[in-house]
């Protein structure tokens, strides 16, 4: 049943491209990004790393597609396959690239950075200031999510998408938290 994820990925790319082209001013440059990886344990040069094979098995895959333009903001889509069936995961854009530990990806990328670390204030840790891609897998272990924010990246950029253990909390003191960091995919936002 590998054709369904491939068709879903193609549909997401086409949808993102049509969104950016239909509303973007002709003089507004559109930035596209795409990343794909098959999760493995960490090794030097790995771009898709699993830290918890019980929740993100080796061989699971992730695809990230994104468009960004001043006229439309930033839209990011995530498609995953091979994860646990019927499971809720959190996922976010993170400030750093993947590394040997999930912590190496750094904090969530925030358009307006929270001066307090770690950031758990819903004023900063929210789906308008961060890229949140929470999803629930189907009975095949396939999931997808889309985020649209009204800002674009400047000189500071996110460098990865991290899959977390649970959906993202929104309450004060816990905003932006989503449990353990399970896996990481390098993305050149």
Residue ranges of predicted features:
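N-terminal leader/targeting pre-sequences
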Residues: 2-88, 93-189
